[in-house]
Amino acid sequence: MWSEYSLEVVDAVARNGSFSAAAQELHRVPSAVSYTVRQLEEWLAVPLFERRHRDVELTAAGAWFLKEGRSVVKKMQITRQQCQQIANGWRGQLAIAVDNIVRPERTRQMIVDFYRHFDDVELLVFQEVFNGVWDALSDGRVELAIGATRAIPVGGRYAFRDMGMLSWSCVVASHHPLALMDGPFSDDTLRNWPSLVREDTSRTLPKRITWLLDNQKRVVVPDWESSATCISAGLCIGMVPTHFAKPWLNEGKWVALELENPFPDSACCLTWQQNDMSPALTWLLEYLGDSETLNKEWLREPEETPATGD
């Protein structure tokens, strides 16, 4: 049976061209080197070296063995390292859920920063809507969720970090009929136009809808890009996160409506599986920061940088 040491011996003999030179490099006696090679040849049932009067040279089988053996040893070393990492809590993947209500640019930056720190761990990020976040967590598909509602629909052992409140804005395109009318608007007035809806991604838990009045038509969209297109086209009323609406409101393309029944802010949280920590998850929890940082970076509209004079 061959070992990492026997491969090292064969490699030394092949490079030096003799058993004695290889023995000198390995700090062994020539007979020990010769014995190791002979035992390996008997196990393989093929000669590894062509023995000449003054030197030795690898046979075709010997050259193949050396090439393949190096590859096997490299894999063995990687396997050994991974076993040690796993014993210390390392896992090759970290799966997280991100609620669609958070600022998308923050998710993108988090991914970049994660891979700068972990080049041997895959970060799997799943975009979920409403109860889809809790569904992914309760099913064990993810280990952490960002932007989950604090109205917890499932039982289980979860740790939490408050993210504060998310504010909503009811918006329409600046050319929409409601934009030309004075508020505050009643539900009876609003239900004459369709409501923008993001479909809940939950597989097993009850599905939720952000804002939909009785007998109101829906415009169902798959993502925020489609949401912006539909709102800008004047197809619907949109109840959207204020941080999402801000650029269009600032440019005058959308108008925020005043409602007789204002939509309340949503309480959000960061939550993760308790007693299932890994180095990557520990790092991510520290990276995400405290409650104030989470609210500022993930739920609020970006702060405008004041202009500076020369």
From Swiss-Prot:
It is found in: Cytoplasm. GO terms for biological process: regulation of DNA-templated transcription. It comes from the Bacteria. Keywords: Activator, Cytoplasm, DNA-binding, Transcription, Transcription regulation. Residues 2-59 form the HTH lysR-type domain. The keyword Cytoplasm applies. Gene3D superfamilies: Periplasmic binding protein-like II, Winged helix-like DNA-binding domain superfamily/Winged helix DNA-binding domain. Pfam families: HTH_1, LysR_substrate. Belongs to the LysR transcriptional regulatory family. This is HTH-type transcriptional regulator PunR. It comes from Escherichia coli (strain K12).
